């Protein structure tokens, strides 16, 4: 009997924590300030270069020693150089 009461109380506690965390998270996700800050983070960070066979539009999209090949679809390929 004591074990079943303890298990029931533990389950209620876990359910309370999960539901309160979900409610708190949904309030934060709907706020426009949160969305604006995330937008600023993604705009301000420097973009990585594209690796071999990655999609590209210009040579500057590709990593060093790679160039954008214009066949459809465009992709980054080795430009034939060995320099560092």
UniProtKB/Swiss-Prot annotation:
Pfam families documented for this protein: Toxin_12 (PF07740)
Keywords from UniProt, A to Z, are: Disulfide bond, Ion channel impairing toxin, Knottin, Secreted, Signal, Toxin
Where would you find this protein in the cell? Secreted
Look up the record and report any one GO term of the cellular component aspect. Answer: extracellular region
Organism listed in the record: Chilobrachys guangxiensis (Chinese earth tiger tarantula)
Q: Output the superkingdom of the source species.
A: Eukaryota
Q: List the disulfide bonds.
A: 49-63, 56-68, 62-76
A Gene Ontology MF term for this entry? toxin activity
Look up keyword Cell membrane and say if it applies.
no
Name of this chain's protein: U2-theraphotoxin-Cg1b 1
Taxonomy-wise, where does this protein's organism fall, top ranks first? Eukaryota, Metazoa, Ecdysozoa, Arthropoda, Chelicerata
Q: What InterPro entries does the entry give?
A: Huwentoxin-1
Q: Could you tell me which SUPFAM superfamilies the record lists for this protein?
A: omega toxin-like (SSF57059)
Specify whether Secreted is a keyword of the entry: yes
Q: Which residues form the signal peptide?
A: 1-21
Q: In which tissues is it expressed?
A: Expressed by the venom gland.
- Domain free text: The presence of a 'disulfide through disulfide knot' structurally defines this protein as a knottin.
Sum up the protein's function in the record's words.
Probable ion channel inhibitor.
Q: Which family does it belong to?
A: Belongs to the neurotoxin 10 (Hwtx-1) family. 06 (F4b) subfamily.
Q: Which residues form the propeptide?
A: 22-48
